[in-house]
A protein has these predicted regions:
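Karyopherin-beta/Importin-beta family HEAT-repeat alpha-solenoid scaffold
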Residues: 1-3, 7-237
Length: 237
């Protein structure tokens, strides 16, 4: 076991060196190099399933390399890595969520067709965002989670994710109702609902009309509109 861990540490250290020293543009022209890197990445990535593993020390390097490998396309091997990341996240490693964000963004925007072809992909990403917005993960991570939900809505407009809109809107407005200190997080939560308005106005209104939160007698629709108007100055675009 100790020998295996040592090999893994050395392997990921080597991958980190590659990530820092190689040009992604050059590697894109040599598919065999990219395929080899993806295979090498998935081997230590598999050992990330246990947060007790010393490989967690290299988590940021693994995420950085995976991001670079998914900027132009997302291979089947890289889609498998999403499941591994989710398992790691479930083991109280959500402190790394902000480091995951660039890679998760690639999953959504670079290969939207594959994202939507398997409901599990979207479910995994939503579950991660929901956990960050539900627990005390800190407003920086919460901003990233809300932003990712907004990106999904905008990226998938007209792609049949109607069933996701109520889930996305509810989780951000519930977070908003708990009180938000920073204008940035408040704005990001509102932007998810605004993206839903752009996606399908009737669906958003129906969603808001059917939402009810404890300890808040004010109609959700009115609260959303009032908060939006009050924070207009914070919207940068």
């Amino acid at each position: 076991m100790r020998r295996t861990r040592t090999r893994t540490r050395h392997g990921v250290g080597h991958l980190s060196t590659i990530a820092q020293s190689h040009s992604w543009t050059v590697m894109e022209d040599h598919k065999e190099i990219t395929q080899q890197l993806e295979g090498d990445l998935c081997l230590p990535g598999d050992r990330l399933r246990s947060c007790k593993s010393p490989i967690i020390e290299f988590y940021e390097e693994i995420l950085s390399l995976a991001f670079g490998l998914t900027c132009q396309s997302v291979s089947p091997q890289m889609w498998q890595l999403l499941g591994v990341l989710y398992e790691v996240f479930q083991h109280d490693c959500f402190d790394y969520f902000t480091d995951m964000m660039p890679l998760l963004h690639n999953y959504v925007t670079v290969d939207t067709d594959m994202l939507l072809s398997n409901p599990k992909h979207l479910e995994v990403i939503y579950s991660m965002c929901k956990k960050v917005l539900t627990i005390d993960a800190g407003e920086d991570a919460e901003c990233h989670a809300a932003k990712l939900l907004e990106v999904i809505i905008l990226q998938c407009r007209g792609r049949g994710i109607d069933q996701c809109i109520p889930l996305f809107v509810e989780v951000v407005l519930e977070r908003l109702m708990r009180g938000v200190k920073s204008s940035e997080l408040r704005t990001m939560c509102l932007q998810v609902a605004i993206a839903a308005l752009y996606y399908n106005p009737a669906l958003l209104i129906h969603t808001l009309d059917n939402m009810h939160f404890q300890h808040n007698p004010q109609p959700i629709t009115a609260h959303f509109i009032n908060q939006w108007m009050n924070d207009t100055e914070f919207f940068l675009g």
